């Protein structure tokens, strides 16, 4: 009986003390216990009586509890364990005040903010505010370092991940969840089950999505996902789905890009589509230009900007009547129609981060001008800086309502038709080409962007992207249908140059 008595006495000794030094709010308190029960967990309670049920994980023969206090004050906890030596033991630790903003949450439909400060969050990965990393034990120290640095770790769960251990190790930290690196290789129902398991156990209610080969939009209807991810170098999928989904989105636009100029241009195109960037800069120069982007966007009301289509065919963002941002990828004359106010006008150089201010303000409803030179791309910034400052003084996160667009599906009103595939069947092995033929010719239709998706509805796996652009080669995933032949539903969505979204669909027989 003596060893049992010593164990209990030792446990009481530890729990009677401050198990962590005073810990700033939103920083980690890790409690290490000389226990061996892998089911050990603790219920933590803060000063405002919100509780967190935290499971332990095993390392070096001991049990570890990780808690991040969300407010200053005294936190108490009570252990539950199958080991009588630890069951019902209690302890406390102190949290001190800090300026940490909290964790990321959804706000204003397509944007993010911090949970504690309620200030906007500018998603900038992988060289800014976010770092993507596999949620593995081997990466434990790196994930802890990301948290300590005040950044967010976008955790990618391997398909064989031990989810309960991942929750215990990382669930208290500043993270987001991606339940798969590429969900398309997995069964949709299995992905949903993994996601629901995470959401049920995640005490901090972190954002959750999935990695993808193209778009995680097919998972949106399942209800668990709260932000969208893309892997879209040309940006057509996120630009079009931005008009459909009431969710924020991030795009890994830089896949395969090694050239600095191409990376910078793709970064700004992604931004103009209303999507946040989530790509690693391929060079040191590209990383510096990403920092230029962060500096510029941080000075805008980025949390209210939406794609704007009255910029003479240029890609643009706007909070109309307050701020307009136009990306001039190919230097030349630009015309922008704005609400009539007194605006400051400036040109931002995305290469070196310098700003050139126009001498005269814009007081009319139309800006017409040329960038300072034609050597490279430029960003035109038209804004009411004094008005923006006033908006910040009387802080209101959301100053306008964002409504989803209704797709025009009436064939008589759609300005294009599906010309390819012809016939009634598509071969999985050799799917052939796709093409949309314009039936109405205008500046708006000439600038149209297309997204082609396919779905075998009977199999319940939702849609997959099979092409982008007006024409090209269909790429049909081999696991799109569980058995062949199958009824294939092909859909094309087209976004014209003034922001109107159209859709057509057609059924085919999918054969081997």
Residue ranges and their predicted role:
Residues 52-109:
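Extended acidic/polar, glycine-enriched regions
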Residues 444-451:
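Solvent-exposed loop segments of extracellular immunoglobulin-like
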Residues 162-247:
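Active-site neighborhood of glycoside hydrolase catalytic domains
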Residues 145, 205, 222-285:
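Catalytic-core region of carbohydrate-active enzymes that cleave or remodel glycosidic bonds
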Residues 88-155:
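An acidic-aromatic substrate-binding cleft motif
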Residues 82-84, 494-500:
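Short, solvent-exposed loop/turn segments at the edges of extracellular beta-sandwich modules
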Residues 456-475:
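Surface-exposed, flexible coil segments in extracellular/virion-facing regions
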Residues 17-21, 25, 30, 36, ...:
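Aromatic- and carboxylate-lined catalytic core of secreted/periplasmic carbohydrate-active enzymes
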């Amino acid at each position: 009986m003596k060893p049992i008595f010593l164990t209990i006495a030792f446990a009481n000794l530890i729990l009677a003390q401050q198990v962590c030094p005073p810990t700033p709010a939103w920083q980690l308190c890790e409690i290490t216990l000389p226990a061996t029960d892998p089911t050990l967990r603790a219920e933590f309670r803060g000063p405002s009586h919100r509780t967190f049920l935290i499971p332990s994980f095993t390392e070096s023969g001991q049990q570890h509890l990780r808690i991040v206090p969300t407010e200053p004050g005294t936190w108490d906890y009570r252990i539950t364990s199958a080991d009588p030596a630890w069951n019902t033991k209690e302890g406390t630790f102190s949290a001190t005040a800090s300026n940490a903003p909290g964790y990321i949450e959804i706000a204003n439909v397509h944007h993010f903010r911090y949970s504690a400060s309620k200030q906007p969050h500018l998603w900038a990965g992988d060289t800014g505010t976010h770092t993507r990393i596999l949620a593995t034990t081997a990466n434990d120290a790196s994930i802890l370092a990301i948290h300590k640095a005040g950044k967010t770790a976008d955790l990618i769960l391997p398909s064989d991940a031990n989810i309960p251990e991942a929750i215990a190790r990382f669930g208290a930290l500043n993270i987001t969840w991606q339940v798969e690196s590429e969900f398309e290789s997995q069964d949709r129902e299995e992905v949903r089950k993994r996601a629901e398991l995470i959401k049920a156990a995640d005490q901090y209610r972190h954002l959750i999505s999935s990695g993808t080969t193209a778009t995680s939009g097919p998972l949106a209807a399942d209800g668990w996902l709260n932000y969208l991810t893309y892997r879209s170098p040309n940006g057509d999928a996120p630009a079009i789905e931005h008009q459909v989904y009431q969710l924020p989105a991030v795009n890994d636009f830089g896949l395969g890009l090694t050239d600095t100029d191409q990376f910078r241009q793709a970064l700004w195109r992604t931004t103009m589509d209303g999507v946040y960037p989530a790509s690693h800069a391929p060079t040191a120069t590209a990383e510096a230009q990403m920092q230029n982007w962060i500096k510029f966007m941080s000075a805008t009301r980025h949390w209210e900007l939406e794609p704007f289509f009255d910029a003479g065919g240029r890609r643009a963002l706007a909070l109309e009547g307050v701020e307009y941002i136009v990306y001039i990828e190919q230097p030349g004359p630009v015309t922008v129609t704005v609400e009539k106010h007194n605006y400051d006008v400036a040109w931002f150089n995305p290469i070196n981060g310098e700003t050139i201010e126009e001498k005269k303000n814009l007081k009319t409803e139309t800006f017409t001008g040329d960038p300072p030179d034609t050597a490279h791309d430029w960003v035109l910034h038209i804004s009411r800086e004094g008005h923006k400052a006033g908006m910040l003084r009387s802080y209101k996160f959301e100053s306008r309502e964002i409504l989803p667009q209704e797709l025009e599906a009436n064939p008589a009103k759609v300005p294009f038709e599906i010309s390819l595939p012809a016939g009634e069947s598509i071969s999985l092995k050799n799917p052939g080409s796709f093409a949309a033929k314009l039936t109405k010719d205008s500046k708006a239709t000439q600038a149209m962007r297309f997204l082609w998706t396919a779905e075998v509805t009977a199999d319940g796996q939702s849609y997959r992207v099979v092409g982008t652009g007006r024409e090209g080669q269909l790429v049909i995933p081999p696991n799109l249908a569980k058995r062949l032949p199958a009824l294939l539903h092909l859909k094309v969505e087209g976004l014209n140059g003034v922001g109107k979204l159209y859709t057509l669909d057609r059924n085919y027989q999918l054969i081997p």
